[in-house]
């Protein structure tokens, strides 16, 4: 998925009134201000209350199919268009205390909404993205791939974050 595709999806969501936050590899590239590698999908964080306009926006883009990947959950699943467009969707609930809840009722996580209020750019277009700290944390919750090693090293270097042991 190239930058034009990512921006087309984000622009469509914005026109629909959906407040989307870029996550994953695109978040790191947005924080770095440049695309550093190819991406197979666009991770997007969206409040569950925006699901209806999000679905309408996705259908207009042809993002109307589920992409089973083995870890599908009601709050995290992948949709695609049968071609190059693929979105890894992360739905959360806004809490009254300024945090968000991500996950199920029994096994979810609450975290500060500020983690989803980072600022970055994709092709010089300003986008909301994960904060540097949160992007780093999200990349350490699973066995790292080769691209994750490069992403994390670049992120830590730019924002002077300590490099996690698994990435040394």
Segments predicted by a language model, with ranges:
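Compositionally biased terminal segments of proteins
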Residues: 1-168
């Amino acid at each position: 998925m190239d930058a034009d595709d990512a921006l087309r999806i984000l622009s469509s969501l914005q026109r629909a009134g959906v407040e989307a936050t870029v996550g994953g590899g695109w978040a790191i590239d947005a924080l770095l201000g440049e695309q550093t590698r190819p991406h197979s999908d666009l991770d997007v964080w969206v409040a569950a209350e925006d699901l209806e306009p999000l679905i309408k926006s996705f259908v207009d883009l042809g993002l109307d199919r589920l992409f089973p990947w083995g870890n599908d959950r009601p709050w995290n699943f992948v949709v695609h268009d049968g071609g190059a467009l693929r979105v890894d969707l992360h739905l959360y609930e806004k809490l009254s205390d300024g945090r968000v809840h991500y996950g199920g009722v029994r096994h979810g996580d609450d975290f500060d909404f500020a983690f989803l209020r980072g600022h970055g750019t994709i092709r010089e277009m300003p986008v909301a993205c994960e904060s540097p700290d949160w992007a780093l944390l999200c990349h350490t919750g699973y066995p790292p791939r080769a691209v994750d090693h490069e992403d994390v090293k670049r992120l830590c270097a730019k924002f002077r974050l300590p490099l996690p042991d698994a990435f040394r």
